[in-house]
Amino acid sequence: MKILLLGEHGQVSRELQLSLRGQGELIVRGRDRLDLSQPEQIRQQLRELRPELIINAAAHTAVDQAESEAQLAFAINATAPGILAEEAAALGAPLIHYSSDYVFDGTKNAPYAEDDVPNPLGVYGRSKLAGEQAIQAVGGAHLILRTSWVYSLHGRNFLLTMQRLLQERDSLNVVADQVGAPTWAGSIADATRQLVERWRHGHAGPWGLYHLSAQGEVSWFGFASAIAEQLRAQGKATATLQPIPSSAYPTPARRPLNSRLDCTRLQRDWHVQLSDWHSALLECLHSPR
């Protein structure tokens, strides 16, 4: 089987390149070889490569930066997924695409289910929602996987930022009123591998929209505290953490206060096993990846 994986150097893609070994011929493309802001380039490459499965792990993920470059964010996060869906449908190839908890406004007092009405707060969330809708409008075989608070040992993310700041500073303020599930990119890749294997062996669940995040919930402050605990276990000095409200840390893009996602549907329909956020953090920190 020929698999096309987009987003070569991204957090999820890097983990997928490990998890999908043995699943077939894996063709990986980054922005240098397939620019998702160029529609004709997308069409040309897919028609030349003719993959049997397309996994789109590429995205414009700079949430604050998106506020000042909406056109680029929509080109990559909205227009490109629609084109990928069209080309995938023409090839008869399923499309797996990753979306975000930021399609919601965070006002619900419980975890969000797939059929809750989206209401994004910023450009990034609006562009991701538009990408979902573009894929759904095509109507081909697809999985849209909304995830949350992605981190890994690569790239730019909360885990790596906290590890650095906790050792550089004496005191550190961290937002405590945003709650969600930090999700290791390795866990997303492992869940994706489970989905691919079930599809390949004829045990696929229904195509469509699903939530995929770590189990459990924690605030950014709680997540930072868990990271600090692991650093101290290694004998490293860490900053004193202070909880603050979101209002004390203004950013160009507003964040939802509730980013919790209900993953029951994915577990029920596809029998995917998901780790809790704290176990996944420990696995990530001790991973040879």
Please provide the spans of the model-predicted regions.
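NAD(P)H-binding glycine-rich loop region in Rossmannoid oxidoreductase-like domains
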Residues: P39-I76
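NAD(P)-dependent short-chain dehydrogenase/reductase
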Residues: Q133-A181, G186-Q194
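Amphipathic terminal alpha-helices
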Residues: S275-R289
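SDR active-site strand-loop-helix element
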Residues: L6, R29, A57-A58, L95-S100, ...
